[in-house]
Amino acid sequence: MLGVSLGARLLRGVGGRRGQFGARGVSEGSAAMAAGESMAQRMVWVDLEMTGLDIEKDQIIEMACLITDSDLNILAEGPNLIIKQPDELLDSMSDWCKEHHGKSGLTKAVKESTVTLQQAEYEFLSFVRQQTPPGLCPLAGNSVHADKKFLDKHMPQFMKHLHYRIIDVSTVKELCRRWYPEDYEFAPKKAASHRALDDISESIKELQFYRNNIFKKKTDEKKRKIIENGENEKPVS
């Protein structure tokens, strides 16, 4: 409904001058409406690396963002920023974070970064404003509910631009693991680099796998039934 409203607003803007532009105005309006509806179907893929999962004390140290269409084709690659945090916070990270962020080179990169949290939010907000209409496109990612908590707190303007719903690949993963265990065995394995852009790319590939190998079965079955029913129906003379 929201996507249609966006397209309708675009259509009214062009179609309202119908007397001046005639059929061309209607055609342009239809194209604008279709474009608006298409943009409303986009997904905003985000991954964060944090100093931990405690929302009260931990902070974002890396963020990346990609935009896909509803078919999971990547349309735009956004910023991939490393955010400056005080050494005291890095020194107080858990052993797990120290090991993995140290091994990936992220800890060193955070110490060398000059990008503030406010600057990062501005960059990401500018990017999603160019790529998506306000309030219509959901946040997507793996266990993205955890990222959302930090974004709600530290990047509220960025989150305000997105739809309130999320697309969490980890939910799909857990359902497929329970309902289609034989297919799930072939799901792509994660490299676990614990870097933001790599993690997003892996999440998109994982959801593509579920769509092509699990959701597709039901879609093909439905198409087959429609075709069979259509072929069985005889035209009325």
UniProtKB/Swiss-Prot annotation:
Catalytic positions? H194
- Please give the InterPro entries that the UniProt record associates with this protein: Exonuclease_RNaseT/DNA_pol3, Oligoribonuclease, RNaseH-like_sf, RNaseH_sf
One Gene Ontology cellular component annotation? mitochondrial intermembrane space
**Protein's UniProt keywords contain Zinc:** no
**Mainly localized where?**
mitochondrion
Modified sites of kind Phosphoserine: S92
Q: Where is the transit peptide?
A: 1-25
Q: What's a Pfam family this protein contains?
A: RNase_T
Query: EC number(s) for this protein?
Result: 3.1.15.-
N6-acetyllysine is found on: K173
Q: Which cofactor does it need?
A: Mn(2+); Mg(2+)
* Any Gene Ontology biological process: nucleobase-containing compound metabolic process
Q: Which residues bind Mg(2+) 2?
A: D47, D147
Give binding positions for Mg(2+) 1: D47, E49, D199
Q: Which PANTHER family match?
A: OLIGORIBONUCLEASE, MITOCHONDRIAL (PTHR11046:SF0)
Read off the NCBIfam families from this record: PRK05359.1
Q: What is this protein called?
A: Oligoribonuclease, mitochondrial
Q: Which organism is it from?
A: Rattus norvegicus (Rat)
